[in-house]
Design a protein with these regions (language model features):
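Hydrophobic residue at the +6 position relative to the catalytic HRD Asp in the kinase catalytic loop
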Residues: 448-450
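Nucleotide/phosphate-binding site architecture used for ATP/NTP-dependent chemistry
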Residues: 1-425, 453-591
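Conserved kinase catalytic-core helix
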Residues: 419-437, 441
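Canonical protein kinase catalytic loop motif
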Residues: 444-446
Length: 591
């Protein structure tokens, strides 16, 4: 039996009603976006069911999951790195036979073209599916999936139809904020990719980056004695012996009253939200502003702890010193310049805190632009291929690149391999070099940025957001680097934890997305692209001094299993806090 389009769930209907009141012109686009939003979130949930160690799951196989109670789930076969692109006309049911070698990304079901069957009954809605499964600890996640689906449909409905890259051209000096705001769908592998509980429709339209707003930050004025300040605080945010702390307007409305605070000046810093929503680029330039927003976005409440304020500057100094030792291969580090947290009842509050960070675009030279990797692998809201494929074709045409990698797209595959090889050399040299010294980056597509030349070729990398790196005092000490006082959460000498952090983010997310976006579902091309990635990693290891630790790191990177963050598992109630990992077949195995 083939299901019809699902009826609106409660949150979907609530957003539709609010949208009709605050932005009626988007109502039709929102309704049209819902089926594909359901398919996108369902695809992420299905990935988790296929590959993560979830409670209640007994067996996992290609397109099949057996539960402990004996029920059988079936759906599209997919590899862990597969992205869920916006449906193309040729993907629609009845549109013809898929090209040979193309991954079976979507079942020929109703709804958004994606369904998972439970003992033969099809589910096209992710929240419906999870509720029917009844996995232990999954009730809150089911509600989050409903919100994620509805907000994703809103994001797609409101996204600009501007075509990233093609409209502006590299010579135009395209701005970082435009790349960031082009990431409409959020995290490519997280089922709660657009979960924003606590944000109304009006607030999402006013503050979310994909809607391209200008957000006006407030200021809270407090005596210096009532504020924890780390680093050199800027004079323009000082008034005599008082500190002016930038605050997000959502926070001013929803949290400051409960803390006994109010803005001393409202809407005085116009800024554009970046991919993370709570980090903004002031319209007039200067440091980026990372604000506290006490709401759960994707999966975490986005406060800024006192420890993060204290650690920001010394951690920036450590990374900058370590990176400098890599010479010409060094990544640029977008440093935290300073931070502040207002004391409430004598204690620095995570809800009234801020960090100021160098803008990554400062590392771009003439005729260069800086773009987060996540912006390169996402499919533009206007349709068409991911931007990285456009870049690869342009770079290949400029250089005349031929790598011998051919496939469904002919010479385009060779261009893709050439672009990927250039980026992989830079990324692995930086990531593995820092790992050898004792610093494991969380190098996923939001934190890792590429400096692109005027032809779209990767020249260097920039790393930002130091809150989730890991630091090994033992490794640092062997390289003559002293570990500053840091929160214990950041510090570990366990090589497994260091490798999970770097390999899971750089390979399991960043390169996974690039291979999927460039390979376009052609498994033969994807395999050759993974070979390109492995070759770059081998060369990066070969250029580092041979040590026992390095040899162990190398064996782990090319071992049979790759750690990948278990995003779905981490949303299940009852588990331990912190990172959880799934160990999956490693596409670099044997390299």
């Amino acid at each position: 039996m083939t299901p019809g389009p699902p009826a609106l769930r409660q949150v979907e209907a609530e957003i539709a009603a609010e949208l009709a009141a605050v932005r009626p012109g988007l109502a039709a686009a929102y309704a049209a976006a819902l089926p594909d939003a359901r398919a996108a979130v369902l695809g992420r949930l299905w990935r988790g069911l296929l590959y993560e160690p979830l409670p209640g799951v007994a067996e996992q196989g290609p397109g099949r999951v057996r539960l402990h109670d004996g029920r059988l789930l079936t759906g599209p076969a997919r590899l862990p790195h597969d992205l869920d692109p916006a449906p193309r006309p040729e993907d629609r049911p009845g549109a013809g036979t898929p090209r040979p070698g193309t991954a079976d990304r979507r079942a020929t079901e109703a709804g958004g073209g994606m369904a998972v069957r439970v003992d033969g009954r099809a589910y096209a809605d992710p929240a419906d599916l999870l509720a029917a499964l009844g996995l232990p600890g999954s009730a809150r996640l089911a509600a989050d999936l409903e919100r994620s689906t509805a907000s994703l449909a809103l994001s797609r409905a409101g996204a600009s139809t501007r075509d990233v890259g093609r409209e502006a051209g590299w010579e135009a000096g395209w701005k970082l904020e435009a790349f960031e705001q082009g990431v409409v769908d959020g995290h490519p592998y997280h089922p709660c990719c657009r979960n924003r509980p606590g944000f109304s429709v009006a607030e999402q339209l006013a503050y979310a980056p994909e809607h391209r707003p200008v957000v006006r930050l407030d200021l809270v004025d407090v005596p210096a004695s009532r504020c924890l300040v780390a680093g050199p605080w800027p004079a323009e945010l000082t008034d005599g012996d008082r500190v002016l702390v930038p605050v997000h307007p959502w926070q001013s409305r929803h949290r400051l009253p409960e803390l006994g605070l109010e803005p001393s000046a409202a809407g005085v810093i116009p800024a554009r939200p970046l991919m993370s929503l709570r980090t903004l680029a002031p319209v007039d330039g200067g440091p980026h502003v990372k604000t506290a927003v006490s709401a759960r976005m994707t999966s975490h409440v986005r406060d800024i702890s006192a420890a993060s304020v204290r650690d920001a500057v010394p951690l920036s100094d450590l990374l900058t010193r370590a990176a400098a030792r890599l010479g010409r291969a060094a990544p640029h580090i977008a440093r935290y310049l300073c931070g502040a947290a207002v004391r409430v009842d004598g204690v620095p509050s995570a809800e009234v805190a801020v960090l100021l960070r160098e803008p990554p675009s400062r590392f771009a030279g003439p005729e260069e632009v800086v773009a987060p990797l996540a912006a390169l692998t996402t499919r533009p809201a206007s349709g068409g291929p991911p931007l990285v494929r456009v870049l690869a074709e342009a770079a290949g045409g400029t250089t005349g690149s031929t790598t011998g990698t051919t496939g469904t797209t002919g010479s385009t595959a060779g261009s893709s391999a050439g672009w990927l090889a250039a980026f992989a050399r830079t990324a692995f040299t930086a990531g593995l070099g820092l790992l050898a010294m004792g610093i494991a980056l969380e190098a996923h597509g939001q934190n890792l940025l590429a400096v692109l030349d005027r032809h779209g070729r990767p020249a260097r990398v920039v790393y930002r957001d130091l809150a989730d790196i890991r630091v090994s005092p033992a490794r640092l000490g062997r390289h003559g680097l002293e570990t500053p006082p840091l929160h214990p959460r950041l510090v570990t000498d366990d090589p497994r934890h260091l490798r999970e952090k770097l390999f899971g983010s750089l390979v399991g997310t960043t390169f996974a997305g690039l291979v999927s976006a460039l390979g376009h579902g052609d498994r033969a091309v994807e395999a050759r692209l993974w070979d390109v990635v492995a070759t770059a990693a081998r060369r990066a290891f070969d250029e580092l001094p041979a040590t026992d630790g390095l040899r162990a790191d190398r064996a782990a990177l090319f071992g049979p299993e790759l750690p990948v963050k278990a995003h779905t598992l981490m949303q299940i109630d009852g588990g331990p806090p912190g990172d959880r990992w799934a160990y999956l077949p490693n596409p670099l195995a044997g390299g």
